[in-house]
């Protein structure tokens, strides 16, 4: 089977705070969920969460990168959802649709940089 991803993924756990971006003009109550990444790439992340997000939903992400302990922010779109344990836990694929250039550089360094010098 041909790999459809554009970017290689790195398997690692990073803390994620995700906030659902409401659709339409009417304000909606803020929905914030906490999660961990299962993998991460320049194009997106895969998370495990108890939040039943819909395909196509947009979320704000704050990701704390485990190796560097730096945080990045991005907006992502839900691309796929898989039930893991009935309707209690979900595996969700998120594609970054907005990420600032400074956050993008932090992510590049995190994924491809040599990391912190050892002392």
Identify the meaning behind each predicted range.
Residues 89-107:
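Short solvent-exposed strand/turn elements
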């Amino acid at each position: 089977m041909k790999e459809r991803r554009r970017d290689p993924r790195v398997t690692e756990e990073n803390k994620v705070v995700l906030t659902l971006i409401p659709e339409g003009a009417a304000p909606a109550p803020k929905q914030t969920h906490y999660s961990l990444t299962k993998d991460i790439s320049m194009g997106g992340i895969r998370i495990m969460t108890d939040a039943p997000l819909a395909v196509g939903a947009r979320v704000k992400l704050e990701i704390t990168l485990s190796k560097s302990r730096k945080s990045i922010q991005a907006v992502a779109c839900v691309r796929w959802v898989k039930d893991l344990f009935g309707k209690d836990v979900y595996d969700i694929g998120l594609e970054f649709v907005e990420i600032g250039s400074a956050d993008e550089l932090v992510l590049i360094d995190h994924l491809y940089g040599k990391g912190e010098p050892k002392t």
